[in-house]
Amino acid sequence: MKPISLPSRLCHSIQSWERVTRSQLDFMVHRFEKDPAYQFIDTKYDLIQQTNVTKTDPVRGRNTIYGWIQGRGLEALAGHAQWLASGNHPDDTKSVSRIKTDIRLLINRLDQRIAEQKCNLTFMMHEDGSKPALFGVERVAENCHFTDLFYSKGLAAAAALLEDSEQFERAKVLFDRVCDDILTDQFVSDQASLDPKNPVKPVPGRHGHGPRMIALGGLSLMLQITGDTRYCEIGFEMIEHIFKHYVHHSNRHDAISSLAQQLQVGDMWEFIDDKSEPWLEAGRVLRCDPGHAIEFTGLAMKFLHHCEQRNLLNSSQTTSAQQWRHTLCHMLQHHVQLGFSADGIGIYKAIDLIQRTPLHSDMPWWPLPETIRAAAFARRYCPAEEVDCYDAIMLK
C-alpha cells in the first residue's frame, strides 16, 4: 500500500478542516444535550437562515424523526470520537467522554422506540413513535430495509466505541441479515418519496445499486472491528455485481450494446430490470445520479483500503483491487465532469445518459463531501497530475 505523502499546502488545509470538524461536532453534540426530553440527533436547523426549523414542518421539523439519520448519526458520532481519541488536542478527552454519554442515551432512546413499535426502526416516525402522514413503504417483517442497514452499522460503530459486546452482537446479527437480503434480492427500500423528481419508491422489476453501495460502508466498518474475511468476500461480491450490471465498459456484450453510441466508458446508471439490463424510464431515459456514482467510488476505495490494512486479500483479490482502483479513479473524474453544472454551483442530482443532459435543476449538498472522501482515497493511486486535481478539490 502506498504511503501517504502530503504537500505542505494540503497539510495546512487539513488543519483548517479539523477546526471546522471540531466546531461542527461540538455544535451537534450541544444540540443533542440541550433538550434532555428529546434525545434524538437534532439536525432540524436551517444553515442558510441560521434558525431552527419550525417544529410543525411535516418534513424538516423536530417532530419528524428519520431512522436513517439516527443510524448514520450514531456511526458519525462514534467515528468522530475515535478520531478525537487519536489526537492530542487539549479538549479531546472531555469531548470523547461527552460523545460516549450521548451515544448511550441515543441507543436507549432508539431501543425504546423499537420496543414500543414492536419492530425495527422505520424511515420516518414522530417523536412519540407514531407514523407521519408522509410515511413511506410499510415494513415487511421478513425483509430488511435501508433503515436496518443504517441502524445496524451505526449501532456496530457505537458498540465498538463503548466496548459493549452485547450491543455489538445485536448489531452484527442485524447487519449480517441485511447483507443476506441484499445478496438474495430480498432487500426492500423503505424510503418515502418526498420529491416527485426523485423516484425512490419501489417499482416491481426495478433494482437499484444503492443497497450494495451503502453496505460497502458497513462492510468496511465490520472489517475494521472484526477482521473477519467473510466481510471482505461479501464486499468483493457486491463491487463485482455493481461493475458488471451498472457500469459501462468497452467490452460489454449484453443488451446495453444497443446504447453504446450514447454511452461513455465509466457511465453508471441507477437501475436495472429483472434481466439485469439497464432500466429505461418511458423507454428512452437512462437515469444516472452523479452523486451516487461518486459515492460508490469513495465507498469502494475505502473498503479496498481496509481490506489491505488488515492483510485480508488473496492474490486474485489483490489483482482485482488494482484493476478496480483504476476504474474507480476514472469514474470519479468522469462523474464530477458529467454532473458539475456549467455555472459551478454544484452537481446535478439526475442526468439522462442517453441525451447527456440534466433531468432537472436540483443540485443537492451531499455530493460535495462524497467527492472529498473519494478524492482522499483516489489520490493514493493516481498519476501525479491527477493527484494535483484532487488536492485542488481539498483546498477548495
Identify what each model region corresponds to:
Residues 2-396:
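Glycan-recognition and catalytic cores of secretory/periplasmic carbohydrate-active enzymes
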